[in-house]
Amino acid sequence: MKFPASVLASVFLFVAETTAALSLSSTYRSGGDRMWQALTLLFSLLPCALVQLTLFFVHRDLSRDRPLVLLLHLLQLGPLFRCFEVFCIYFQSGNNEEPYVSITKKRQMPKNGLSEEIEKEVGQAEGKLITHRSAFSRASVIQAFLGSAPQLTLQLYISVMQQDVTVGRSLLMTISLLSIVYGALRCNILAIKIKYDEYEVKVKPLAYVCIFLWRSFEIATRVVVLVLFTSVLKTWVVVIILINFFSFFLYPWILFWCSGSPFPENIEKALSRVGTTIVLCFLTLLYTGINMFCWSAVQLKIDSPDLISKSHNWYQLLVYYMIRFIENAILLLLWYLFKTDIYMYVCAPLLVLQLLIGYCTAILFMLVFYQFFHPCKKLFSSSVSEGFQRWLRCFCWACRQQKPCEPIGKEDLQSSRDRDETPSSSKTSPEPGQFLNAEDLCSA
């Protein structure tokens, strides 16, 4: 049975960020910054409440009589109680022999084109730990992108405008960045396990390191770009946020309406149609929050029973990073054109170059992960290197086709001029084979 390290990491980030945010908000209050205090508390307490609801919903405590658990969640102590419960189950699992076990069937990764199916016994204790890990993974994603990401953006914006970074603010920004990166990492792992549910997935440590570097560069660059743009064009940033929000929020619903599928009713039996709609809207909001800052790795599909698309779409990945890179470049250009005196001692061209290189570095680590460290890379129809080689061949072929056509066209023009200058009584004529070859080559 695996040690529940992911549960411990989720609880640590939750407690550390909440404590740092409450401490910093008291500092803002003593300094008279009421607006910064209110926003800091909002981005701290809102994800706390959502995390409590998530843990309560995943464990289905609504249908069970557990008043103490409900009270602890109302007091915002639910994650601590769940973590204590997880470690009690973990340390007691080896002492008691379980009379009832369930058997799960998983397929191994193909070796030499063959994939074997293996059976594994899962006891009640291990099943409970799996449920707890799943609940804390989802809670970490919610905390990261509905709380930590806005919190990091806010605190960095305050630091830029005040031209000062205090110890409390730097501590909160560091914890928030770690929380976002960890949430994005959990998104990648959840996406892999959902898409390849029938396989036994084992993620290697180097894969975790590669994902961590990929997400760190991507998220840090995105947050800095948004803060720089907000510091010079406060009104226009609202337009950028609304465009991003409605684009990602409406996209899954537009696909659902175009598919003509019936409204999903099998999310939770205890939920009514209104409750199902609220849950779907919340999932869409979370999906939007993730894509505002980084690639979600999970595509929301409302017409699917699992609500997740299990197909890996390279085209969507390519389009997302191309559009996001262009958007970041445009925002940095606008910041460079309208920057104020607070950036007097900042080398603006160098900063723009560093941010663009940082985003390209994130894309590089992403490609390295999918090429070398993805646990299910053997199931891909084509790898990253093969796709790049195909694109390079097409590009070289197009360049080769354009180069021969230009001089041949000049030779044809010169030969036609010579033919016009030749007297009509002359029997000399150009060979038709030359024109035929040129026309065939250019048409090809």
UniProtKB/Swiss-Prot annotation:
Q: Where is this region: Disordered?
A: 408-444
PTM-bearing positions, type Phosphoserine: 115
Membrane topology type? Multi-pass membrane protein
Q: Give GO BP annotations, semicolon-separated.
A: amino acid transport
List GO molecular-function terms, semicolon-separated: protein-macromolecule adaptor activity
Assigned keywords, A-Z: Amino-acid transport, Disulfide bond, Endoplasmic reticulum, Membrane, Phosphoprotein, Transmembrane, Transmembrane helix, Transport
Q: Where is the sequence biased in composition, kind Basic and acidic residues? A: 408-422
Q: Where is the composition biased (Low complexity)?
A: 423-432
Q: Where are the transmembrane segments?
A: 3-23, 38-58, 69-89, 141-161, 172-192, 209-229, 236-256, 278-298, 318-338, 350-370
Extracellular-facing ranges: 24-37, 90-140, 193-208, 257-277, 339-349
**What Pfam family does this protein match (any one)?**
XK-related
| Cytoplasmic compartment residues | 1-2, 59-68, 162-171, 230-235, 299-317, 371-444
Record's subcellular location: Endoplasmic reticulum membrane
Q: Where would you say this protein principally sits, based on its record?
A: endoplasmic reticulum
One of the record's GO cellular component terms: plasma membrane
Q: What does this protein do?
A: Recruits the lipid transfer protein VPS13A from lipid droplets to the endoplasmic reticulum (ER) membrane.
What is known about its subunit structure?
A: Heterodimer with Kell; disulfide-linked. Interacts with VPS13A.
Q: Which family does it belong to?
A: Belongs to the XK family.
This protein's name: Endoplasmic reticulum membrane adapter protein XK
> Which species is this record about?
Pan troglodytes
